Amino acid sequence: MDFLTSSDFWFLTGTSLAKTIFLIFLVVLPMVSYTVYAERRVSALIQDRVGPNRTGFPTSLIPGVTKDWSPFLGGLGQPVADAVKFLLKEDFVPGHVNKLYFWLAPCLAMMPAIVTLAAIPFGSEFLGVKMVVADINVGLLFMFAISSVSVYGIVLAGWSSNSKYPFLGGIRSTSQMISYELCMGLSAVPVLLVCGSTKLSAIVGYQVREGWLLAPFTDGGLSVREIALWVPIIIAFITFTISMFAETNRLPFDLPESETELVAGYHTEYSSMKFALFFLGEYTAMIAGSALIVVLFLGGWHLPFIPDGAGQGGLTFLHAIPSWIWGLVNITAFFAKVAVLLLVFIWVRWTLPRFRYDQLMKLGWLYLFEIALVNIFLTAGILAFTK
């Protein structure tokens, strides 16, 4: 009871609330909006089109600005226009749907993706505050557990629509997401064996000391152990990334939507903001998946030879610069890595064709599952012989 009335309790509560608001309203929503915009521009570039390049901001309304610069902003106002469009569209609910579950499904599809971000450390420290909402010991297991709930939203959307196409999309998503969750979990085990922790900040801390798992030379040197572990880590990275594509229903794994076969799959009957929630959930899951890959394999917020937000590590002469500046650098580095991975998601979507359903299951169960399982024993053997 004394803790509840102490200043430490209110400090932790206040900083956690501030980090949550920052993460949702200043990171997730803008990143989702401009990831959609980036996808439309990149797809246009790949297909030799122009893409959205007209919608801007009326800069002439700003006091002191006489010229309208909106045509030169390259369509950067398009996400705002899209948001307004979704808000103003009629929220039509077909008469044949099961209304309770029809309304519940978009929330179940979106919320897990946002909640998983709570365990992601997106920086070291900033002004003495850890840049993670919930620095829990079971961070990786927490992310796997919460992200698995999103399949219920997709299944409910397909079932409650009382329509053949959404139902088929929901059934596909069930088998696909459950199959690839297993592969994704097994792919993460070598990282846990090497780092010795399921706490995400501890995994990043290991990479700060020993070098990124995918690029161990970033600590300034290479040992025999690091060279030997490099092979299973690369295998784990490949299988984990492929599984993440399948978990987020992105091409070439978008069988639950599959526009050429199922119209729009599980969200065929949805419109307006309920459709936008599915959209938001998909892109938030992409951000969470990219962030998890950065944490597990790419050193999290760490940049080689750069101190963290607490003034630890890095080159000695850089410690003369205030630590809060390095805290900002760490946060920027983390989200820059996430942005690069998001571009990879977009690039792959507009490059590779969709798998057939039998090919999807064959890849997951006959290849990725066995490779991830053998890779665990390979990692354990290397750790045992190089101890």
Regions flagged by a language model, labelled:
Residues 1-387:
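Selective transmembrane helix interface/packing segments
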